[in-house]
């Protein structure tokens, strides 16, 4: 999966199309990412009381994971780009690059 935690992404499909956000968590086995401020849902949780007597629960708004095919990584210029790889000569490791301008992401 070419999208990682900490990347800034642009939503290219769905109800939040055009929104930018930071990837909070990646789920590579499910091919989904959790993006800050995108795909917000209302979750109903049971009201419970903790030991101090404070109540928690009710209707909570939170982000839900979105499929990676619906997002594009934003490169250093602030524009969406496809992600490629190249081999770093010094370290011998794979480095992610922007296919749009060839720079490192």
Swiss-Prot record:
What InterPro entries does its record include? Answer: KOW (IPR005824), Rib_uL2_dom2 (IPR014722), Ribosomal_uL24 (IPR003256), Ribosomal_uL24_CS (IPR005825), Ribosomal_uL24_KOW (IPR041988), Translation_prot_SH3-like_sf (IPR008991)
User: Which controlled-vocabulary keywords does the entry list?
Assistant: Ribonucleoprotein, Ribosomal protein, RNA-binding, rRNA-binding
GO CC list: ribonucleoprotein complex; ribosome
Query: Which Pfam families does the UniProt record give?
Result: KOW, ribosomal_L24
GO BP: translation
**What Gene3D superfamilies does the annotation carry?**
2.30.30.30
Classify the source by domain of life. Answer: Bacteria
Looking at the keywords, is RNA-binding present?
A: yes
PROSITE patterns for the chain = RIBOSOMAL_L24
Q: Which GO terms describe its molecular function?
A: rRNA binding; structural constituent of ribosome
Q: What does this protein do?
A: One of two assembly initiator proteins, it binds directly to the 5'-end of the 23S rRNA, where it nucleates assembly of the 50S subunit. One of the proteins that surrounds the polypeptide exit tunnel on the outside of the subunit.
Family affiliation: Belongs to the universal ribosomal protein uL24 family.
Matching PANTHER family: MITOCHONDRIAL RIBOSOMAL PROTEIN L24
Note the subunit structure: Part of the 50S ribosomal subunit.
This chain belongs to which protein, by name? Large ribosomal subunit protein uL24
């Amino acid at each position: 999966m070419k999208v990682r935690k900490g990347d800034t992404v642009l939503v290219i499909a769905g109800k939040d199309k055009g929104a930018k956000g930071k990837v909070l968590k990646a789920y590579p086995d499910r091919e989904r990412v959790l993006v800050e401020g995108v795909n917000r849902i209302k979750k109903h949780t049971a009201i419970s009381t903790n030991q101090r007597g404070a109540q928690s629960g009710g209707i909570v708004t939170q982000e839900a994971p979105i499929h990676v095919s619906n997002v594009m990584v934003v490169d250093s210029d602030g524009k969406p780009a496809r992600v490629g790889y190249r081999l770093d000569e010094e370290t011998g490791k794979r480095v992610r690059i922007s296919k749009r301008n060839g720079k490192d992401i």
